[in-house]
C-alpha cells in the first residue's frame, strides 16, 4: 500500500491576534488582561494608542481613528467556497492576481489552510519549472491553492506567500455584510507607499503595546536584583 503524503499546518509569522497560526501567549496576570481589554475597546471605538486616547487625553477624538487597513470598507474575510471555513483576511492580503494567475496572494493564512508536505514541480502553464506545495482546506479537504518554494524571476516575489485560488473562495465584506465570489470581487491593490505607511503604523502600535506590557510586568514582578536578607 502506498504511503499517503504527510500534511502539516501552514507556517507563518506570529500575528497580533485571532486564530492565525503562531499566536501569542496569554497573559496570566489580571492587570495585563484588563489592559488588553481596554486596548481592544479603544480599537472598536475608533481610537488607538497613537491617538489622543493613547496619550491620556481627557476628551476622546472627534472622529474615528482606526488604522487605514482596518477601515470597514477595506476589510473582508476570505472563506472556502465549499464549507465556508475562514482561510484568510484582507489585512494580510498582498496582491490580487486573479486575472493573471487566478489566485489571491496572502502573507498569512489561518490554521484552516493545510500545506501538503511533498514538493511538486510544474511542467506546464504559469508554474512551469516552479517547485511548490499544494494548499488544502483543512475542513473539507479540497485544494485551495499553492505555496511557492522556488520559481522563475517573474514569480519570484510570490515565494513564501500563500496563493489561494480565487475560484475556490467566497468573500465576506464587513461593511456591506455581503458574500460574493472572490473571482468576481474587484480588489484594489494598495500602492507601495501606502503599504509602507501602514507598516510603520503597525510597528508603532506594537511598540506602544509592548511598552505597556513591560510596565505592567515591572509593577507586578518583584525586583530580582535586590539581594535577599
From Swiss-Prot:
InterPro entries membership: Mis18, Yippee/Mis18/Cereblon
Is Lipoprotein there in the keyword field?
no
Residues carrying Phosphothreonine: 14, 221
Residue limits of the Mis18 domain?
75-174
Question: Keywords on this record?
Answer: Cell cycle, Cell division, Centromere, Chromosome, Metal-binding, Mitosis, Nucleus, Phosphoprotein, Zinc
Which PROSITE patterns does the record match to this protein? MIS18
Q: What is the effect of changing residue 172 to D?
A: Abolishes interaction with MIS18A
Q: Where in the cell is it found?
A: Nucleus; Chromosome; Chromosome, Centromere
The UniProt entry's GO biological process terms, in alphabetical order, are: cell communication; cell division; CENP-A containing chromatin assembly; chromosome segregation
Q: Which residues carry this modification: Phosphoserine?
A: 48, 225
A GO CC annotation recorded here is: nucleoplasm
> Which terms does the record give in the GO molecular function aspect?
identical protein binding; metal ion binding
Where does this protein hold Zn(2+)? 80, 83, 137, 140
Function of the molecule: Required for recruitment of CENPA to centromeres and normal chromosome segregation during mitosis.
Q: Which family does it belong to?
A: Belongs to the mis18 family.
Q: How does it assemble?
A: Homodimer, and heterodimer with MIS18A. Identified in a complex containing MIS18A, OIP5/MIS18B, MIS18BP1, RBBP7 and RBBP4. Binds outer membrane protein OpaP from Neisseria gonorrhoeae (in vitro).
> What's the name of the protein?
Protein Mis18-beta
